[in-house]
Amino acid sequence: MELNHRREMETDYIVFAGREINQEPIIGFVNFTDITSIYSGIYNFTPRMNLTMRIRHNWSKVIYKSFANVDANGNDVPRAFIPNRDENVNFFNLDAFFTWDFRLGSRIVFGWKNFLGNEEFVDGSVHRKYLNNLGQTLDLRHGNELTLRFIYFIDYNSLKKKR
């Protein structure tokens, strides 16, 4: 079993925030946080049969602190705050595979993938803490995909001898 957790933060990070009516660019000064947690593991039932799993959650949030326009010299000129621009994005994936090598070169793999749907959203203004946000993410609707792969090795020489 392995758990990896990475947290990246930037303060007063400058981002493109849109354009004025006259097409002048607007920049935003934001605090950016990106957290990724990955839990993975493998369990061997026998030397030829195992279960592998990988769970990944990524949470990115952007909180706008102020906005500015850019003058002809490239300097920032403070402007009025634009409300409701903060962003909160979650990605969640779970991949599990049961593999059985039932004969040399031959195997059956059963896979299950669980993922957060594209239309699902967690309100970052309410759920500001990581574990609270993760809990809300797990409560949302998820998509599921099941796969079955069958690989069978046929030895041409053994077929040729039987004729």
Model-derived segments and spans:
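Exposed, low-structure sequence patches enriched in small/polar residues
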Residues: 1-163
